[in-house]
From Swiss-Prot:
It comes from the Eukaryota. This is Structural maintenance of chromosomes protein 3. It comes from Xenopus laevis. Residues 530-642 form the SMC hinge domain. GO terms for cellular component: chromatin; chromosome, centromeric region; meiotic cohesin complex; mitotic cohesin complex; nucleus. GO terms for biological process: cell division; DNA repair; meiotic cell cycle; mitotic sister chromatid cohesion; regulation of DNA replication. Forms a heterodimer with SMC1 in cohesin complex. The cohesin complex is composed of the SMC1 and SMC3 heterodimer attached via their SMC hinge domain, RAD21 which link them, and one STAG protein (STAG1 or STAG2), which interacts with RAD21. The lineage of its organism: Eukaryota, Metazoa, Chordata, Craniata, Vertebrata. PANTHER family: STRUCTURAL MAINTENANCE OF CHROMOSOMES PROTEIN 3 (PTHR43977). Pfam families: SMC_hinge, SMC_N. It is found in: Nucleus; Chromosome; Chromosome, Centromere.
Length: 1209
């Protein structure tokens, strides 16, 4: 075992967490400048392992925390990790960590991260070989010097610590304390013995007079016994007579009470039947009111449906007439439209011909006019231009403008032509779309009709189910009334049971149920729920005849809770307390009940109570524990005999009980308050209630739930159908709207078609004129410039004038004819579009609407609904009439029961009067019996007060009469008066004091033996202490000589035990002799001296005070090594032990450490190079910014530290 690693944080100069690299198991050297933190590192290890830092005050703990710049350190810890591969520490781990944590208010130890106490740590270290009496496995700075300068007495003290004499001293102190206590007790006993001797002498004189007194007193007591015994016998005879009368009266009272109980039971049964009938009547009346409300509501619905049906029928008849009228009007409109279309067909060709001629004439007129204009312009250009070139230039310019204008005209004509073509194409598409929409409209109308029909079918089915549900609701309400009555009955029974049971017990039962319900709700502790079996009373049954005796036997144990195991009860109680629930609970854990088989007597007068109980054999232990040692007996006499003979509890059927301990209990027991009977009634009502609830849940509520589900499904279907209806109707409206829009587009297109055609003709005529002008200008280009037209041009102008006049005349005629034909066409088209066709559309729409209504779907659905409501009205009326009959019968039955109730009440009253009379008689007998019992008790008390009597006293005066007895008693009392001054307790006191004397003498002897044992123990302890010191001195002395010779070759050193005489005035060497005594005392030792010679010569042996400082240090080191060899530790910590040594001795110390390091670990600090030579691992401590750091370094770096400690500072 050795220190493997040290971790420091916040301790003194080590602020940050410092994890020291693992140490070697042999020799480790730590080097560093003064003040760098080497000693603090040693303090850290000592802080964990040594007793020096055990009891720290808060200010001392704060002093150990790091103080420097930066945040304030509030806690520190030092952790040492041991290599435990040799299992020196009794922990089955190869590495063991020990940490100590301190703060302003805490000081804790952790062993392998588990908190432990300081004592645990110290005991663990002692088990690993760390002795409290030898703390020299850690040698701090200055310890060597302290030992070198210590006096002899200090070294003796050290030797005693190493020898472990502290234990002997502690035992000796305990023995001295015990001896003082024994001396005190011995003195007290001596005082008591002296007092008792004096008192016994006085009592010896009083004994003679006491003998005469006792003679007459014995006679008096015998006479008094005889008198009291005669009175007692007379009283017993009278009591027996009264007891016989009471038994007779009791039997009669039992018969009367049984008859009264029968009457009460009958009354309760009748009362229950009356309550049930009243509840039934109330339910039926309530149902009747509901039926009446339903019937009124149904009649209202029927009236509405009848009116709706009539309206639909009237509407259907009116629609038929309207349809005929509309069809007739439609036919007339079609004929008129056909007539107008025919007229239009005749007029339009004429109009087209006239219009074509007109347009041709207009075009020709424009062409001729333009040609004439061009010729006139040609004539005018002779005066307009001065030369041919100027004219040609102008013509070219005009031609360019004309070309551009002609191109514009052509583009306009092409655009209009394209527009007209698109209009034709759109017209065809419009017609196709219109036809398709018309087909879609018919399909949508068909689908709407189908949905309407389906909707009314689903609605009728839903109404039927609602009617059925109403009936089931009424049935459920009736069952609920019965349930309410049962619950009320159950509550009354439970209230009676609660009144007969303690509140704390009932609260306990309720609290246990809450705990179990909490477990169920959380889904936890299922084994606890399964392991709880309820209270005793709920787990067995028996015949009613045994209720009284069973209940008296069990008492409150009827409410004990049976559980599978103590674990179950513990879990329940933990949650019980956690939830802070009220009540009192007692558990019977089956696994902990120790029940033995009982041998029952074989007799016809008694039976084991447990044989009359019916229960699950799984709970046999619990029932044997409660009832196993009780017999049911025929009578009280039998109970008394068997209880004495078999040491068993016995009880009669009436509840009179005889305990095996002798106690008798009994009296009248009111069976009306029997908790078993009440519990049986509660369970019976609970079973009936559960049956009703099951019937309600399984039949009615299940059917209601099924119908509700079906109604919900139908409602969903209706909603889906309504959604589809809205969807299709919206689609229909959308189609109609689209058809209307297409029709309007077609009409608009037709309106714009003719103006576009006229515009096209005008553009073509204008284009033709422009082209003619362009040709004329082209022909003129390059010709001679003339001021007059040529003959040919003049002729052409004249011809054009004639043609223009003729064309103007023809155009005027064609215009008049066209306007006339156009007016006719416009009038006919307007009549067709604005009148006939619009009206035809209206008629068609009205016919479509009529077709939708004529489908008869609404009327059919309404008729079916009317038939269904009529059936429901009829069924409701029949049910209401049936209820009237049932209510009348039930009320008659209830009245009969009330009359029967009155008869039983009278019977119960008669029985009660008889019981009261019998009770009064019984009360008189009881008072008389009480007086006799009191007299009996007085006689027995007086007999008991007489004390023990001789046998002759029971028979000597039996023949005398009471008069003779009283005369003799008077004579005795007269004689006794003479000895009134006698100490009547003299004899008792004499005996008592004699016994006390014997006890005190025995106690005195015991104390003497104890005193002797203590003295012997103290001598043994003193001897052992002496032997331990002697043995330790020899071992240390031997080791010291050997170590010194190794450190100083050729040198010699010895330890000398110094003694003194008894008075301490003289001393001598150990070798010269010792004080002769039976038990040698260690007090004779005054110190341990040291004599050394560095040359080995006996003549040069010197004392410590004669040595130089370095020699003293070397001798002190030799002593420390000697002590360590005597009591070895697994590792050693030396802080600058070579400080005062010269180089030669430092080398010797280094060699010594190297030798010892093969068996133990050494961690040393030094400023000298000699110790580095024997080291296996090196560590350097640096101090920067007031914080220490420790790291592994090489041997060369360690030597640098030692040779020049400023290099790495």
């Amino acid at each position: 075992m050795y220190i493997k690693q040290v971790i420091i944080q916040g301790f003194r100069s080590y602020r940050d967490q410092t994890i020291v690299d693992p140490f070697s198991s042999k020799h480790n050297v730590i080097v560093g400048r003064n003040g760098s933190g080497k000693s603090n590192f040693f303090y850290a290890i000592q802080f964990v392992l040594s007793d020096e830092f055990s009891h720290l005050r808060p200010e001392q703990r704060l002093a150990l925390l790091h103080e420097g710049t930066g945040p304030r350190v509030i806690s520190a810890f030092v952790e040492i990790i041991f290599d435990n591969s040799d299992n020196r520490l009794p922990i089955d781990k190869e590495e063991v960590s020990l940490r100590r944590v301190i703060g302003a208010k805490k000081d804790q130890y952790f062993l392998d991260k588990k908190m432990v106490t300081k004592n645990d740590v110290m005991n663990l270290l002692e088990s690993a070989g760390f002795s409290r009496s030898n703390p020299y496995y850690i040698v701090k700075q200055g310890k060597i010097n302290q030992m070198a300068t210590a006096p002899d007495s200090q070294r003796l003290k050290l030797l005693r610590e190493v020898a472990g004499t502290r234990v002997y001293d502690e035992r000796k102190e305990e023995s001295i304390s015990l001896m003082k206590e024994t001396e005190g007790k011995r003195d007290k006993i001596n005082e008591l013995l002296k007092y008792i001797e004096e008192r016994l002498h006085t009592l010896e004189e009083e004994k003679e007079e006491l003998a005469q007194y006792q003679k007459w007193d014995k006679m008096r007591r015998a006479l008094e016994y005889t008198i009291y015994n005669q009175e007692l016998n007379e009283t017993r005879a009278k009591l027996d007579e009264l007891s016989s009368k009471r038994e007779t009266s009791g039997e009669k009272s039992r018969q009367l009470r049984d008859a009264q109980q029968d009457a009460r039971d009958k009354m309760e049964e009748i009362e229950r039947q009356v309550r049930e009938l009243k509840s039934k009547i109330s339910a039926m009346k309530e149902e009747k009111e509901q039926l009446s409300s339903e019937r009124q509501e149904q009649i209202k619905q029927r009236t509405k449906l009848e009116l709706k049906t009539k309206d639909l029928q009237d509407e259907l008849a009116g629609n038929s007439e309207q349809r005929k009228r509309l069809l007739k009007e439609r036919q007339k409109l079609l004929e008129k439209i056909e007539e107008k279309q025919k007229e239009l067909a005749e007029t339009e060709p004429k109009f087209s011909s006239v219009k074509q001629k007109e347009e041709s004439g207009i075009a020709r007129l424009a062409q001729a006019t333009q040609e004439r204009t061009d010729l006139y312009a040609k004539q005018g250009r002779g005066s307009q231009f001065t030369s041919k070139e100027e004219r040609d230039k102008w013509i070219k310019k005009e031609l360019k403008s004309l070309d551009q204008a002609i191109n514009d005209k052509k583009r306009q004509i092409a655009a209009i032509n394209k527009d007209l073509e698109e209009t034709e194409v759109n017209k065809e598409k419009n017609l196709e779309q219109y036809t398709k929409l018309d087909q879609d409209l018919n399909e949508v109308k068909t689908r709407v009709e189908e949905l309407d029909k389906k909707y009314y079918e689903v609605k009728n089915k839903k109404d039927e189910l609602q009617s059925e549900r109403n009936y089931l609701w009424r049935e459920e309400n009736a069952e609920q009334q019965s349930l309410a009555a049962k619950r009320e009955d159950l509550e009354k029974k439970q209230q009676l049971l609660r009144a007969a049971t303690g509140k704390a017990i009932l609260n306990g039962i309720d609290s246990i149920n809450k705990v179990l319900e909490h477990f169920r709700r959380k889904g936890i502790n299922q084994h606890v729920i399964n392991g709880y079996h309820g209270i005793v009373m709920n787990n067995f049954d028996c015949e009613p005849a045994f209720y009284t005796c069973v209940e008296v036997t069990a008492g409150n144990r009827l409410f004990y809770h049976i559980v599978e195991s103590d674990e179950v009860s513990t879990k329940i109680l933990m949650e019980f307390n956690k939830m802070n629930l009220p009540g009192e609970v007692t558990f019977l854990p089956l696994n902990k009940l120790d029940v033995r088989d009982t041998a029952y007597p074989e007799t016809n007068d008694a039976i084991p109570m447990i044989s009359k109980l019916r229960y699950n054999l799984r709970f046999d232990k619990a029932f044997k524990h409660v009832f196993g040692k009780t017999l049911i007996c025929r009578s009280m006499e039998v109970s008394t005999q068997l209880a004495r003979a078999f040491t068993m509890d016995c009880i009669t059927l009436e509840g009179d009980q005889v305990s095996h301990r002798g106690a008798l209990t009994g009296g009248y027991y009111d069976t009306r308050k029997s908790r078993l009977e009440l519990q049986k009634d509660v369970r019976k009502v609970e079973d009936e209630l559960h049956a009703l609830e099951a019937k309600l849940n399984e039949n009615l509520r299940r059917n209601i739930e099924r119908i509700n589900n079906e109604i919900d499904q139908l409602m969903n279907q209706m909603q889906q159908i309504e959604t589809q209806q809205r969807k299709f109707k919206a689609s229909r409206d959308s189609i109609l709207s689209e058809m209307k829009m297409l029709k309007e587009k077609r009409q608009q297109s037709e309106k714009t078609f003719m103006p576009k055609q006229r515009s096209l003709q005008s553009l073509e005529a204008s284009l033709h004129a422009m082209e003619s002008t362009r040709e004329s200008l082209k022909a003129e280009l390059g010709t001679d410039l003339l001021s007059q037209l040529s003959l040919e041009d003049q002729k052409r102008v004249d011809a054009l004038n004639d043609e223009i006049r003729q064309l103007q005349q023809e155009n005027r005629q064609l215009l008049n004819e066209r306007i006339k034909l156009e007016g006719t066409i416009t009038r006919v088209e307007t009549y067709l579009n604005e009148n006939l066709r619009k009206r035809l559309d209206q008629v068609e729409q009205e016919l479509n609407e009529l077709r939708e209504t004529e489908g008869g779907t609404v009327l059919t659905a309404t008729t079916s609904e009317l038939e269904a409501i009529n059936k429901r009205v009829k069924d409701t009326l029949a049910r209401s009439e049936g209820l009237d009959i049932t209510i009348d019968k039930t009320e008659v039955e209830s009245k009969d029961l009330v009359k029967s109730m009155d008869r039983w009440k009278n019977m119960e009253k008669d029985h009660m009067d008889a019981i009261n009379h019998d009770t009064k008689e019984l009360e008189k007998m009881t008072n008389r019996q009480g007086m006799l019992l009191k007299k009996k008790e007085e006689c027995m008390k007086k007999i008991r007060e007489l004390g023990s009597l001789p046998q002759e006293a029971f028979e000597k005066y039996q023949t005398l009469s009471l008069k003779q007895l009283f005369r003799k008693l008077e004579q005795c009392n007269t004689e006794l008066k003479k000895y009134s001054h006698v100490n009547k307790k003299a004899l008792d006191q004499f005996v008592n004091f004699s016994e006390q004397k014997e006890k005190l003498i025995k106690r005195q002897e015991e104390l003497d033996r104890g005193h002797k044992s203590i003295m012997e123990l103290m001598n043994v302890l003193e001897l052992r202490k002496y032997e331990a010191i002697q043995l330790t001195f020899k071992q240390v002395s031997k080791n010291f000589s050997e170590v010194f010779q190794k450190l100083v070759p050729g040198g010699k050193a010895t330890l000398v035990m110094k003694k003194g005489d008894v008075e301490g005035s003289q001393s001598q060497d150990e070798g010269e002799g010792s004080t002769q005594s039976s038990v040698p005392s260690v007090d004779q030792f005054t110190g341990v001296g040291i004599r050394v010679s560095f040359t080995g010569k006996q003549a040069e042996m010197r004392e410590m005070q004669q040595l130089s400082g370095g020699q003293k240090s070397l001798v002190a080191l030799a002593l420390i090594f000697a002590i360590q060899k005597c009591d070895p530790a697994p590792f050693y910590l030396f802080d600058e032990i070579d400080q005062a040594l010269d180089a030669q001795h430092r080398k010797a110390v280094s060699d010594m450490i190297m030798e010892l390091a093969s068996h133990a670990q050494f961690i040393t600090t030094t400023f000298r190079p000699e110790l580095l030579e024997s080291a296996d691992k090196f560590y350097g401590v640096k101090f920067r910014n007031k914080v220490s750091h420790i790291d592994v370094i090489t041997a060369e770096q360690a030597k640098d530290f030692v040779e020049d400690d400023t290099t790495h500072g």
